[in-house]
Amino acid sequence: MNKVILMGRLTRDPEVRYSQGENSTAIARYTLAVDRRFRRNNDGEQTADFIGCVAFGRSAEFAEKYFRQGLKVIVTGRIQTGSYTNKEGQKVYTTDVVVEDQEFAES
């Protein structure tokens, strides 16, 4: 089973593009800052993980229309890994959450 549930704040507005072809599909990418449960050190400083999310189709269009930097959201999805070769010829590994459901966490 591959399932993840996250609650966090958008670090910036989603980046949206559309796939090429006859049936173009919206693709939205955004990053969530998800607070860790524990404090980093004795000064009480909160730490967060920054997790990349990608939404497709209607979910992407929803994110484009309603999601903005700083908004607190809940995302349900699955983890997907991948890789690509960058301009310097180095292999780069990626980990993203493919969004299955997303909703507002506060009104």
Placement of each model-derived feature along the sequence:
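Single-stranded nucleic acid-binding surfaces, predominantly the OB-fold ssDNA-binding core
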Residues: 1-107
